[in-house]
Design a protein with these regions (language model features):
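FIC/Doc superfamily catalytic core
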Residues: 1-105, 109-173
Length: 173
């Protein structure tokens, strides 16, 4: 079900890529992703809303559920103040989003959908993290504050793969 829902999310991103990124859009993506899944049957799981219970990523704590709305509001305010958005801005938003980890589950998928949205919105060639790049990608996220080049270089490589596909299908970028 989540695979079908993920395609619905991609359609939503494409349809709304020129819209300003808002909490409403982000929550709607989560609702699209998690509707009619086993998670949606759990009374403690908030489909389309922020987490109710604390969670962690790779053993690291994330934002307390009571603070998520405030943190997301601040993240979006800072992002939406940018006059011109580049790849590093998109990646920084993603890393901060992952650290907040606003939803009980699905944060990585929602975060990657948001990067796709931001790339489309800002005329940045999108990218897909393939299995062969996953370790470098995860290392880049973990080391973002010290050496953001790890993640940037990994995503630039992924962009090169994406460009090859665009060229193959004669799609201008």
């Amino acid at each position: 079900m989540e695979t079908v829902n993920h395609f619905r999310c991609i359609d939503y991103v494409i349809d709304h890529a020129t819209d300003k990124l808002t909490e409403t859009h982000i929550k709607h993506l989560h609702q699209l992703l998690k509707t009619n899944t086993s998670d949606s049957q759990k009374e403690w799981f908030a489909v389309g809303d922020y987490k109710k219970l604390a969670n962690e990523v790779g053993g690291e704590g994330t934002t307390d559920p009571k603070e998520v709305h405030k943190e997301m509001k601040q993240l979006l305010a800072e992002y939406n103040l940018l006059k011109q958005v580049n790849l590093d801005d998109v990646l920084n938003f993603y890393v901060q989003f992952e650290r907040i980890h606003p939803f009980q589950d699905g944060n990585g998928r929602i975060g990657r959908l948001l990067m796709f949205w931001q790339c489309l919105q800002n005329n940045i060639v999108p990218f897909i993290i393939t299995e062969d790049l996953r370790l470098y990608y995860n290392r880049g996220i973990q080391n973002w504050d010290r050496i953001n080049g790890f993640l940037t270089d990994t995503c630039l490589t992924a962009q090169d793969y994406y460009k090859e596909h665009l060229q193959y299908f004669s799609i201008k970028f």
